Amino acid sequence: MFYIVPREPQQRWGLEQRWLLPMALSPKDFDEPLLAPDTAVRHYVVACHREKAQLRGTQTLNYIEHWERQVLNPRGLARPVIGVHNLPRVRKTRRDPWYNLVDDLTRRGTAPVLLPRRIYQRYRVVWNQAGWVAGENFIEVLPQPQVPLEPLLAVLNAGVSEMALRVSAHVYGGGVYNLSPGSVGEVPVVDVRQLSAERQDQLTSAYRGFLQSKGKDRGALDTVVLDVLGLPPTFAASLESALGRMQHLSDAVLEPIAVDPNEGNTWLEELCLL
């Protein structure tokens, strides 16, 4: 795939960092629910708007010309195509130069909150602090103005939110919980703007503890969120039991690399893997 470059090929080619953007391709790409400036990058997006004449002497030009010579067999065509630039979907965009995704990526922007598109055993909402480009395995969330981000992330990572999202998802065979942007918008979430400053501070503190555990311990976070909702401490055990049964449905499921690119898709076609 020309536009998405894993770290190993990037290093092998020696592709210049100034024409690459870090990409969150899959929840399996990182071990904690935070994309910080120092998070290790496993995939990049080629983001170069320079003409080939301006790229002389660079590894990026060698990479581009390599892909212009490749024989490809796109689905739906009877004959092979020589070069990524001659693929019908690439020619249809009329980008100048053909590999320039910079304008589209700039218009699209990035979101600070990444929901998993499909939920398996593990559920984590990612804070996209570093502003990575998100792939099709995520639903990007742009909070409303004036919504404090860390309290919101605390609520979204809590067990009650996991339950609400799993309930609203379509369940596929094998226990795969598939979320769509439309259904996510209808899931009830605590309006953290309406909480007192003290409550917001409690949520922020609990969320930072959750991050320190690399997303492995949300006990304190759940306690604060249940208290905010006015639910008794005994509710936590019932919640964990119900979530355990839901997660058990996914025990035998292997997480795929990609999802259906036609379902609620807002990604650039070149960044879809199917």
Task: Please state what every model-predicted region is.
Residues 1-205:
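Polybasic, glycine- and aromatic-enriched phosphate-binding surface used to engage nucleic acids
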Residues 59, 191-274:
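Non-catalytic DNA-recognition/assembly elements of restriction-modification systems
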